């Protein structure tokens, strides 16, 4: 990389108050100087940059230094005043370059001219010949008063370059929103192949210079916007899904709580309606009640697992089920099998046998009674 010491000459005349460059010429110049300083120091860490004003006394604000922060802090203290003296400012910058510490550094002057140059063309050409002899390159950014200055400054740069030289440049920038953008794409900051000296991919949005490839920069910007919209949509969907899951979990908890409450109430009602005074019952009545409770418990479990939509149909069939249950309870063989499977119950116990016998005799009587009623109904029909 080229080792270079650069003096930046800034225009601080009254013309810099104009607003043809946003927000003013002076502030647009500050942004451009910022880019120049960073470009020079990043291209080579050993490069040095100094700062000098062109108006009135051509004051040297900072001598050659690699500290861009120091340069920029001095730059922001500059206020518009008076008129520029272009030739004097260039001579002072040349003297500052002669006192550079690194004698192997090439010398370069970058001058911002935003005011009319009052020096005549002969003086400019004479100064250019002297600088060429000293091997000093000069880059000029001509803006704001390009109609007045372009001819003089072109003669100055052409004299510096000679017939074959290309070390010095003149960049004329028409009024526009950004002086810095025009400078980035200019030969002053462009190396071989158009690469920006000291400006990596991180200095441009999406890593692409919009002036070098505007179509690619636009495509990347559109793609980035679409990606941002997709991410926002996915975030909204995820938030909605999380809210829906939370709502389902809450509803499920409420449903389970309601079911548990209903079951508890049903069990309490069942206990109140079906719990007689066991102390007043005989042993045979207690055994019969135990068998009845086991049957009712089975029916209760089946009723809890049944579909709620069939409740009306179940209500209409309750008399039939009660008759079937009564018939089952009066079946001695079924009761005998139930007693044999009950733990701690001896089917051969005398009390159990007596209870079974009484149930059997009752069943026989009921059967005969039902038969008589059926015969009587048939006779009435005849």
From Swiss-Prot:
Q: Which residues form the UIM domain?
A: 211-230, 282-301
Q: Which UniProt keywords apply?
A: Isopeptide bond, Phosphoprotein, Proteasome, Repeat, Ubl conjugation
- The VWFA domain sits at 5-188
Q: Provide the residue span(s) of the region labelled Essential for ubiquitin-binding.
A: 216-220, 287-291
Q: Where is the stretch described as Interaction with UBQLN1?
A: 197-262
UniProt xrefs under InterPro entries = PSMD4, PSMD4_RAZUL-like, UIM_dom, VWF_A, vWFA_dom_sf
Chain positions with Phosphothreonine modification: 250, 253
Crosslink site: Glycyl lysine isopeptide (Lys-Gly) (interchain with G-Cter in SUMO2): 122
Q: Give the GO terms filed under biological process for this record.
A: proteasome-mediated ubiquitin-dependent protein catabolic process
Could you tell me where the Basic and acidic residues compositional bias lies?
224-237, 365-382
SMART domains attached to this UniProt entry: UIM, VWA
The superkingdom of the source organism is: Eukaryota
One GO CC term on file: cytosol
The UniProt GO MF terms for this protein read: polyubiquitin modification-dependent protein binding
Q: Where is the composition biased (Acidic residues)?
A: 321-330
Region entry Disordered, spans: 224-252, 301-382
**UniProt xrefs under Pfam families:** UIM, VWA_2
Report the function annotation for this chain: Component of the 26S proteasome, a multiprotein complex involved in the ATP-dependent degradation of ubiquitinated proteins. This complex plays a key role in the maintenance of protein homeostasis by removing misfolded or damaged proteins, which could impair cellular functions, and by removing proteins whose functions are no longer required. Therefore, the proteasome participates in numerous cellular processes, including cell cycle progression, apoptosis, or DNA damage repair.
Q: Report the sequence similarity comment from the record.
A: Belongs to the proteasome subunit S5A family.
Q: How does it assemble?
A: Component of the 19S proteasome regulatory particle complex. The 26S proteasome consists of a 20S core particle (CP) and two 19S regulatory subunits (RP). The regulatory particle is made of a lid composed of 9 subunits, a base containing 6 ATPases and few additional components including PSMD4. Interacts with NUB1. Interacts with SQSTM1. Interacts with UBQLN4. Interacts with UBE3A. Interacts with UBQLN1 (via ubiquitin-like domain). Interacts with DDI2.
Record comment regarding domains: The 2 UIM motifs are involved in the binding to a multi-ubiquitin chain in a cooperative way.
What is this protein identified as?
26S proteasome non-ATPase regulatory subunit 4
The scientific name of the source species is Bos taurus (Bovine)
* Record lineage: Eukaryota, Metazoa, Chordata, Craniata, Vertebrata
Whichever gene encodes this chain, its name is PSMD4
